[in-house]
């Protein structure tokens, strides 16, 4: 180049324009119609004029009659509502319309109890060779989830249940089916959501007197989902029977037509094995959410159980497991035990890291 000692060199450069971000968080999210509806509503709970405390005319308003927020704890306690609806929870967390800034980050993030591979610090080999505080999951404190994704389950016709009961009455074996339907606003809970079931599809199964054997995944799943979409439906949950006649000998006339009550406060409502299966199904049917960094958050998938109530009558009970259970099942941290009321935490090994798990609750005296 003919350079000599002391020569000065000058360099120039041009700024490269950054390409538009195409991350999943900035892409449009196809939410359920009910989520779009509630995101466009204020959700305030109206109150009537209080003759005892209000000191104004019918067209006035004061602190005693002004609308209250959908997450008001006093209103929920007075109406016996134990959990917030999902959209009321979003309002409580002050999650509103996203900013127009390109640097906007959705506030919700899915729980994950897996070890981060590779480590964000990049200072050591990935798990299981080594681990640090930046890539290992924190200790887990189990607690009741404040909100629920679905507040009510409704069947459009009793014949949907009768068909499953007829199979049990004829064969004395349990049955399983997927619930096909849609979601609608539920007016009994502030900003509530209900699952409306319009059909039940029973996949290939082998029924037993005390359980069901399923082939997972079922072969015609894609076809059934496609047919459901053509009808404006989707898979909203699952249902199965857990029935046993109260008098197997049929010798007591007073027990005729009654079934045993297996699930109650002194036994269990959903066994550990059923809770794990529900978590797996919920993880396979996650909820599309614009407020989540991954565009997915929790699940609206419900689990319905046909079993006997304390009166000996057949009743439908609906359940959902929390996001914590879904994350623990995804991380392969828990397993069912021989006791239906207990779930066992797996030990750590060379391929599984399990952090400390604690349980936190408030007793009847309000002590944490």
Where are these regions (language model features)?
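N-terminal beta-strand/alpha-helix entry module and adjacent surface
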Residues: 7, 13-237, 241-351, 368
